[in-house]
Amino acid sequence: MPGGLLLGDEAPNFEANTTIGHIRFHDFLGDSWGILFSHPRDFTPVCTTELGRAAKLAPEFAKRNVKLIALSIDSVEDHFAWSKDINAYNGAAPTEKLPFPIIDDKDRDLAILLGMLDPAEKDEKGMPVTARVVFIFGPDKKLKLSILYPATTGRNFDEILRVVDSLQLTASNPVATPVDWKKGESVMVLPTLPEEEAKQLFPKGVFTKELPSGKKYLRYTPQP
């Protein structure tokens, strides 16, 4: 498909009609981190569970200075009506308000620009719908992570929150997060960091795992 973003690309400063009115994307993001996530259609089962979970986790994203914004090829009017179903699914009052806006991309302009269309999933007119895309942008407006799911597989928003924790931690410290890492657990010191410098940067200690190769690349430290 034409369009699309690669890691490190700056987010296009697009304009869009949303459930909070007309926006410019860079103005919407401000100095925050941002997550732009698309879904195939309003009033569908998997999408309802996804946005319901995103709504429940919205306070956790806000604590991390992350703004959420959703997108689909449905109209703002549909977004408002569907929001009632999402809130009801969450056991809340069936209002039109969600803790994040949803973009109206019924002409598919943004879906094409950002490479979000799923050619395997079509609407009633035979046109491709948006896939389950997740873009995470840093305060510099650059793409830090992208994930693409097919329509049949719902996303894990707890995992997306975990990824945000990793991205924010590693943006300000010379560390990486190992497999299955969770916030508060030990992290790995980057192999490029000299040993003496690592000791100075991480006063809680640097612990090296001995390996048959004799190479000292598995270095752990408590989370800074």
Curated annotation (Swiss-Prot):
Q: Does this entry carry the keyword Nucleotide-binding? A: no
Annotated positions of the N6-acetyllysine modification: K63, K209
Gene Ontology annotations for the cellular component aspect, listed alphabetically: cytoplasm; cytosol; lysosome; nucleus; perinuclear region of cytoplasm
In this UniProt entry, the residues modified to N6-succinyllysine are: K209
Any GO BP annotation:
cell redox homeostasis
Q: How is it modified after translation?
A: Phosphorylation at Thr-177 by MAP kinases increases the phospholipase activity of the enzyme. Phosphorylated form exhibits a greater lysophosphatidylcholine acyltransferase activity compared to the non-phosphorylated form. Irreversibly inactivated by overoxidation of Cys-47 to sulfinic acid (Cys-SO(2)H) and sulfonic acid (Cys-SO(3)H) forms upon oxidative stress.
What changing H26A does, per the record, is: Abolishes lipid binding
In its keyword annotation, does this UniProt entry include Hydrolase? yes
Q: Where in the cell is it found?
A: Cytoplasm; Lysosome
Every Thioredoxin domain range: 5-169
**Mind listing the GO molecular function terms for this protein?**
1-acylglycerophosphocholine O-acyltransferase activity; calcium-independent phospholipase A2 activity; glutathione peroxidase activity; identical protein binding; peroxidase activity; peroxiredoxin activity; phospholipase A2 activity; ubiquitin protein ligase binding
Q: Which reaction does it catalyse?
A: a hydroperoxide + 2 glutathione = an alcohol + glutathione disulfide + H2O; a 1,2-diacyl-sn-glycero-3-phosphocholine + H2O = a 1-acyl-sn-glycero-3-phosphocholine + a fatty acid + H(+); a 1-acyl-sn-glycero-3-phosphocholine + an acyl-CoA = a 1,2-diacyl-sn-glycero-3-phosphocholine + CoA; 1-hexadecanoyl-sn-glycero-3-phosphocholine + hexadecanoyl-CoA = 1,2-dihexadecanoyl-sn-glycero-3-phosphocholine + CoA
Site feature Important for phospholipase activity: at which residues? S32
Which residues, if any, are the signal sequence? none
Keywords, in A-Z order: Acetylation, Antioxidant, Cytoplasm, Hydrolase, Lipid degradation, Lipid metabolism, Lysosome, Multifunctional enzyme, Oxidoreductase, Peroxidase, Phosphoprotein, Redox-active center, Transferase
Chain residue ranges for the region called Required and sufficient for targeting to lysosomes and lamellar bodies: 31-40
Give the E.C. number(s): 1.11.1.27, 3.1.1.4, 2.3.1.23
Q: Recite the other comments.
A: The active site is a conserved redox-active cysteine residue, the peroxidatic cysteine (C(P)), which makes the nucleophilic attack on the peroxide substrate. The peroxide oxidizes the C(P)-SH to cysteine sulfenic acid (C(P)-SOH), which then reacts with another cysteine residue, the resolving cysteine (C(R)), to form a disulfide bridge. The disulfide is subsequently reduced by an appropriate electron donor to complete the catalytic cycle. In this 1-Cys peroxiredoxin, no C(R) is present and C(P) instead forms a disulfide with a cysteine from another protein or with a small thiol molecule.
Q: Which family does it belong to?
A: Belongs to the peroxiredoxin family. Prx6 subfamily.
Q: How does it assemble?
A: Homodimer. Interacts with GSTP1; mediates PRDX6 glutathionylation and regeneration. Interacts with APEX1. Interacts with STH. May interact with FAM168B. May interact with HTR2A.
Q: Report the protein name in the record.
A: Peroxiredoxin-6
